[in-house]
Curated annotation (Swiss-Prot):
Pathway: tRNA modification. [4Fe-4S] cluster binds at C127, C130, C218. It comes from Actinobacillus pleuropneumoniae serotype 3 (strain JL03). The gene is ttcA. This is tRNA-cytidine(32) 2-sulfurtransferase. One of its GO terms (biological process) is tRNA thio-modification.
Length: 318
């Protein structure tokens, strides 16, 4: 190998390292901001990270372990995988990986695959039943482990897809919440990747070379409604840079007085002479001002290099 080739290789390695460092910082910052904004993790928490073997849950576990090292509070992490007894599922991969990184873990074995195949006719979508079965098992496991938070690997794109699915097929303006409490009030579920882009997670997963396990039960089913919406959003992202970022921002900037739900805004109670703070009533006859370009740009399109954000404001349990 000549000197020029060695120099070129060195420069390429530096570039790869620089880009990975930038990517990791962005994911750390996004996860840290989500944790702070929604008070996801508190001092003394035991966080049960649900690990499926996919890129999202691997990234979630990796970033949380990374943040734990510098967090101003103490919290514990336990990784949990639900072995659903799918034919050909490589049972050795996750235990080997989790032991290699030294994290506490538990493998829960439940034949949900058999139940789903028995109950759902061939060709029908199994997602709904599979999800309900998993939820019940994970709630039970969290109680057994003494976990105070259950962390799932859903990201920003999942939340947007769910928003559109509910609008298109359910007639609801509803997405995935970044934090929720179970119906019985006993479990709190968090989604620390809520601010993270799927394409960032994909790049990070490839760089870290996580041992990905494909899902043959639900994710491989063709013609799912979610896949159609996903492809629609990906097309928009390619054709209109910044649109996805602006749409997600819209989920955090809601004007109830300009929607149509009387249970959320007292339209009937509006009377002459009232002055309502924070209600944009005076612009009712104005033409909506729609900017030509998205208000928020994709960070990949920006030239600014991002350094470490300020200390994450975890809160303490009283």
């Amino acid at each position: 190998m000549n000197q020029d080739t060695q120099s070129a290789n060195t420069q390429q390695e530096k570039k790869i390292a620089y880009n990975f460092n930038k990517l990791q910082k962005r994911l750390r910052r996004n996860v840290g901001n989500a944790i702070a904004d929604f008070n996801m993790i508190e001092d003394g928490d035991k966080v049960m990270v649900c690990l499926s073997g996919g890129k999202d849950s691997y990234t979630l576990l990796d970033i949380l372990l990374n943040l734990k090292l510098s967090a101003p509070i103490h919290f514990d992490i336990v990784a949990v995988n639900l072995d659903q007894k799918q034919p050909g599922f490589p049972e050795h991969i996750l235990p080997e990986y989790l032991e290699s990184i030294g994290v506490e873990y538990k493998i829960v074995e439940e034949n949900t695959y058999g139940i789903v195949k028995e109950k759902i006719p061939e060709g029908k979508t199994t997602c709904s039943l599979c999800s309900r079965l998993r939820r019940g098992i994970l709630y039970r496991t969290a109680t057994e482990l003494g976990a105070t938070k259950i962390a799932l690997g859903h990201h920003r794109d999942d939340m947007l897809e769910t928003l559109f699915l509910n609008m298109f097929y359910g007639g609801k303006l509803k997405s995935m919440p970044p934090k929720l409490i179970s119906d019985d009030g006993k479990q709190i579920v968090i989604r620390p990747l809520a601010y993270c882009k799927e394409k960032d997670i994909e790049k990070y997963s490839q760089a870290k070379q996580f041992p990905i396990i494909p899902c043959n039960l639900c994710g491989s089913q063709p013609n799912l409604q979610r896949q159609v919406v996903k492809e629609m959003l990906q097309t928009w992202d390619r054709q209109y840079p910044g649109r996805i970022e602006t749409m997600f921002s819209a989920m955090q900037n809601i004007t109830l007085s300009h929607l149509c739900d009387p249970s959320l805004f007292d339209f009937k109670g509006l009377k002459l002479g009232q002055v309502l703070d924070g209600v944009e009533g005076d612009i009712a006859f104005d033409k909506a001002e729609i900017p030509n370009q998205p208000l928020i740009q994709d960070e990949d399109e920006q030239t600014t290099d991002y350094g470490e954000n300020g200390m994450i404001q975890f809160k303490q349990v009283q």
